[in-house]
Amino acid sequence: MKYYVSTAFLDTHEVIEIAKAADDLGYHGMGIPDHVINLETLKTPYPNTKDGKRRWEAFTDWPDPWVMIGAIALVTTRLHFVTTVYLPAMRDPYSAAKSIGTAAYLANGRLELGIGVGWCEEEFTLMGQRFDRRGRRTDEMLDLMKALWQPGWTEFKGEFYSAPRLEMEPTPPHIPIYVGGLSDIALRRAARNDGWIGDLITTDRAIERVDRLREMRAERGLSMDDFTILTPLTDAFTPEHYERAEASGINGIITMPWMFYTGPESTLAEKIDGMRKFRKDVALDG
């Protein structure tokens, strides 16, 4: 099992020290969330809570994920970084490819691109991007960005984007792509790529998604070998819980270790101490 420390809702100044600690303590990676802005009033309900309200308070930090990854890549040696999740369709494909590719180059093979199609229509509008057909645009953007990340000249013609013969440097190492979401559409998109990222979910519900992904991969003649299943679990607290998850095919856990010990108001020192305790309590070294 690989453990990723989530940086969601952290103060930006804490992330560097959390990353250094995670690197030293043997965590596999860090999860880096993405929001450009936080609007005071929304008509669009948040899809992952029963009441449609956002999980975060106003004035929560949302640092740019690629600037953040570039910074922490330079102060760590083995830690991986995954976006949880980035919304390509809210940007233009060339700026997105440049930012992602540069961060991947600096991370030297330690970047994992987690993507979603988004839920907040108002944020798309503010960014000058259409909300409708964002799923199809996301698929095409991924194809275009993969072409831009290859060495040499490339050109592209699609339904939404076209590119004359061009090149983009620096050329990054291979970037695995994981897709977030709980719907069948999101799972199918994940099955076509390199992995799936879940939301806050029980182990039983996560296992249902794993079984569905296995079916979808089999339909395409693909195995689950080297396919990443990465999710937070709301009811996993012990080594036995994580062993059950791993036996089902879940191979990555997103967690905030300090939440098990000192809670959401933890100081930076308490967060790092919680990471040490969690490492010991779940037998991170096996």
Segments from the language model and where they lie:
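Active-site-adjacent structural elements that line small-molecule/cofactor binding pockets in enzymes
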Residues: M1-G286
